[in-house]
Amino acid sequence: MPRIAIVGGSGVYDFPAENKREETVKTPYGEVKITVGVVGDEEVAFLARHGKGHSIPPHKINYRANIWALYELGVERIIATSAVGSMNPEMKPGDFVILDQIIDFTVSRPRTFYDGEESPHERKFVAHVDFTEPYCPEIRKALITAARNLGLPYHPRGTYVCTEGPRFETAAEIRAYRILGGDVVGMTQCPEAILARELEMCYATVAIVTNYAAGMSGKKLTHSEVVELMQKKSEDIVKLILAAIPLIPKERRCGCKDALKGATG
């Protein structure tokens, strides 16, 4: 039973592991295909967020099915990757950012498992989970330590602005997000991080800066540019995650595991 899962974003459609097998997990929100393999002494699950070959746009991803499927497999910890545009001049293309905060500007995505009586499962209640610190401190610490030990260009914190997509942002939007305190911008952290918290799973993300955001460089933004840089950084992404996995404590002492306490009723 995998304790740890990797959710691969743009440019991360597979992960090296031994004895791989494909699992099809049925959830109340649909079926999900997950790869399970062995990394070191850990059984690890891998899920390609956008599907193989980037076939699903960010606003159409079945986030609820994905997170529920990992939960059903017994996953407690999730390491996600996310390609991002930088709004912070200090965060350059090729840098890694271990995210610590989110500003959510998505508008059309289902963002909770707890829809009361309308929930398609036995948890027919309403929950208001605490999201003060959206990312697991224990996984973040492991990622930061691994990045430092490997000598990778990294930033130990960063605020992610999540937009609806699939279009890139306007220059005016980026100026507004910078005023609000955003460092990087992307399209997938919400509701993914929220849903993981609702199921009391630990979740953290390593963001990879692929370009400067709209209006920052004067260049046209292209998805091919994102994929190209992610391919160049793929080896470092794998090294970072492989180095972080053994640093994640077996026993969870973070607040993620108790997210539903006080959230209902």
Curated annotation (Swiss-Prot):
Binding of substrate, residues: M187, N211, Y212, A213
Coiled coil: none
Resulting phenotype, H223A: Decreases catalytic activity for insosine and allows the enzyme to phosphorolytically cleave MTA with a catalytic efficiency about 4-fold higher than for inosine
Disulfide bonds: C136-C202, C162-C190, C254-C256
Sites marked Important for substrate specificity: E169, H223
Annotated effect of mutating N211D: Decreases catalytic activity for insosine and allows the enzyme to phosphorolytically cleave MTA with a catalytic efficiency about 4-fold higher than for inosine
Keywords carried by this UniProt record: Disulfide bond, Glycosyltransferase, Purine salvage, Transferase
InterPro entries reported in the protein's UniProt record: MTAP, Nucleoside_phosphorylase_d, Nucleoside_phosphorylase_sf, Purine_phosphorylase-2_CS
Biological process, per Gene Ontology: L-methionine salvage from methylthioadenosine; purine ribonucleoside salvage
Resulting phenotype, C254S: Fully active, but reduces thermodynamic and kinetic stability of the enzyme
Thermal profile of function: Optimum temperature is 120 degrees Celsius. Thermostable up to 133 degrees Celsius.
EC number per UniProt: 2.4.2.1
Gene Ontology, cellular component aspect: cytosol
PROSITE patterns per record: PNP_MTAP_2
Catalytic reaction list: a purine D-ribonucleoside + phosphate = a purine nucleobase + alpha-D-ribose 1-phosphate; guanosine + phosphate = alpha-D-ribose 1-phosphate + guanine; inosine + phosphate = alpha-D-ribose 1-phosphate + hypoxanthine
SUPFAM superfamilies: Purine and uridine phosphorylases
Miscellaneous comment text of the record: Although this enzyme belongs to the family of MTA phosphorylases based on sequence homology, it has been shown that conserved amino acid substitutions in the substrate binding pocket convert the substrate specificity of this enzyme from 6-aminopurines to 6-oxopurines. It seems that P.furiosus has developed a specific enzyme (PF0853) for the metabolism of 6-oxo-purines, next to the canonical MTA phosphorylase PF0016.
Subunit structure: Homohexamer. Dimer of a homotrimer.
Role description: Purine nucleoside phosphorylase which is highly specific for 6-oxopurine nucleosides. Cleaves guanosine or inosine to respective bases and sugar-1-phosphate molecules. Involved in purine salvage.
Name of the protein described by the UniProt record: 6-oxopurine nucleoside phosphorylase
